[in-house]
């Protein structure tokens, strides 16, 4: 079984085993100081496994608080984003199989949203789940 060191290079075309159906996988970080992200969607399902930090994210038009141990599940075509962080956020992402004819990477309905935006660092809200 091969080992993909996603800390060095995300799993994707070129280092993905032939039998692997996952389109891509790796680690992303949004630091509390000078963090950036972009509103985007995919032609496949995507999952974020949060392992460090706390943040507010958006998916399906709804806002959610996330913390270590949470899995954010985004269906094909659903726009998602990181809205604000309360501490440095780190997560493992993977994009499920892309269907034939599907596109890979971050897709944007509005070209002006393709540019990353600053993610503000804010104090932890009182209603953040324990």
Which residues does each predicted region cover?
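A short glycine-rich, His/Asp/Glu-containing loop-to-beta-strand
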Residues: 2-39, 96
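Non-cytosolic beta-sheet module surface loops
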Residues: 39-41, 84
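Short, conserved beta-strand element in jelly-roll/cupin
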Residues: 41-57
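Beta-strand residues in well-ordered beta-sheet regions across diverse protein folds
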Residues: 50-51, 58, 83, 92
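Short acidic-glycine-tyrosine-enriched beta hairpin
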Residues: 61-76
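Ligand-binding loop in jelly-roll beta-barrel domains
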Residues: 76-103
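Acidic/histidine-enriched, glycine/proline-rich intrinsically disordered or flexible terminal extensions
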Residues: 101-130
């Amino acid at each position: 079984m091969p080992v993909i060191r996603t800390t060095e290079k995300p799993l994707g075309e070129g280092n993905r085993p032939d039998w692997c159906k996952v389109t891509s996988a790796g680690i992303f970080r949004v630091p509390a100081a000078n963090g950036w992200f972009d509103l985007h969607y995919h032609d496949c399902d995507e999952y974020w496994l949060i392992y460090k930090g706390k943040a507010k994210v958006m998916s399906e038009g709804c806002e959610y608080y996330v913390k270590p141990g949470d899995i954010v599940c985004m269906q094909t075509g659903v726009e998602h984003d990181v809205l604000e962080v309360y501490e440095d956020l780190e997560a493992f992402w993977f994009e499920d199989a892309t269907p034939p004819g599907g596109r890979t990477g971050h897709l944007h309905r509005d070209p002006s949203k393709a540019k990353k935006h600053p993610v503000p660092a804010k104090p932890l809200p009182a209603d953040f789940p324990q």
